[in-house]
Each structure stands twice: as C-alpha cells, then as structure tokens.
Amino acid sequence: VNTPAPSSSLLSRLGARLRPRRLSVRQRTLLVCAVPLVALFAVAAFAPLPFVLAQPGITANVLGDSKDKPVITVSGPGSGEAGADDGKLLMTTIAATPPGATVRLPQVVENWFRTDRAAMPAEAVYPVGDNLKEVEKHNQDEMRSSQNAAVKAALRQMRKSPRDVRVSLRLADVGGPSAGLFFSLGIIDKVVGDGRGGGLTGGRVVAGTGTIKADGKVGPVGGVPLKTRAAKRDGASVFLVPRAECADAKVEQPKGLRLVPVETLSGALKALDALRDGGRVPSC
C-alpha cells in the first residue's frame, strides 16, 4: 500500500512547532539570576552552621542523691537545726549537641519551630569554642565557682560562719553555673529548713534555675523554656526563674507549672514561705 508523501506545507508547519521558542530578555535575566541563587540555597542547606540543637535535660534533686551520694552534705556544730523536707528542690538542665557537632540548615529550621526543641547559637552554649576538653574544663570551673558562691550566699543568709557549718557539694555529670540558686536553697533547707521544724518546699516539687553571687543576687541563665519543660516532666508544680527571664519562660510555659520570679536568695525564700503559708506569691 502506498502512502502519500507529506506536503511541503505540512513539513514547514511541523518544523515551526518543533523550533524552540526564544526567551525574552526578561526571562533570560531571571534565569541567569536564579541559577546562582539555587546554588547558594543548595550550599546553605548542606553547609555546617554555628548552632547547637538543644532539648530538655535532666533534673536533679539537690536534697537527694547523685549516683548514690548526697548532693549536699552539711556538718559542724551549727548544722543540726533542720527538720526533714519531704518535697524536692530540682535544679534543671538542657541537653545540647556536643561542641563541634555538624548542624545543618534543615535541622535548624525544624528545631526552630518546635516547642520541645531549640536551635541555639553555639557561642551561647559553648562560649569557649568547639574543643570538647576546653568546654568541659570551662563548665567544671564555672560549677566550682558557682558552688563556692552558693555556700557563701547561704551562710550569709543564715548568718553563720564556715566554722559553724561545713558544706560539701557534689553533683555528677553537670557543669556550668546555673544551679547556684538551688545549691543555696538546698544548703539552707538542710541546715535550718523553714526555721519552724519543717522544710522549705512545704512538700512540693519546686524546680528552677539561676546563677548566684556571694551577696545573694540571682542572675539569668540560658535555655529557660526547655528547663521549664524538664521541670514539668519530672513532677514540678512551681518554677523559680530569674526575673529577667520571665518573658522567655512564659513563651512556652507548660500547663500547670507556676512561674515565680526571683532576684535574690532572700526573695526566693520569701516566695517559698508564701507558698507554704498561702500568702501572696509573685508571678511572671
């Protein structure tokens, strides 16, 4: 069977359809600009960024034990006045990726929008750099300084001298200065309690965070929203927070966790007194 040959007019029409369309000047300009942008986003997505990923960490009851040894031990002639406290004083932490760990843009974006995770600037968590040994040494040095300040602040608050009360502090696997306030509260609870034969907590689980100076001033710390989640997870109903960080704490405040702002050790003790006695308690 013979088939007719395609006409020249049909071929010309097909050729016209098959010829690529020419891009306009505007389209070519957009294409030229888009190529480096796409390449830039591709590089950014896989390049390591100076962030760490953090989540709620452990809590530790400073009135209890850490690895089978008391966190706080007191002795001396002025150390036997306190009664037993059946509540808890929980210091709180965050858990972060180690210094120098590779963190990429997709991880930062994902953690930025989660309420139970956070992406934080690396320098805010590891101010001395990304060498693990240096970071660990720095954190342990800060912990020792914090403990020394906590002892001085507690003794000053109780008007006792180191000759009257000898204090030993031990908290395994935790570094940094943010447990200072709770070390001081724990020392006072173990030495004099509430001054009426009871403990400071009134049987509650009280959590919190904050640095401490020898004069009793409470300072801000990092990661408060994550620490409030750790506190709620471990049974706390009250969270003592440095007043300067009330706004941060309220952003992701867990339901049922009462935020109590503090500026000094004396103020923290007054707030705990008010909680026990049903008095007026400050609030964020």
Regions found by a protein language model. Name each.
Residues N2-C284:
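Peripheral, non-AAA+ core regions of ATP-driven protein-machinery
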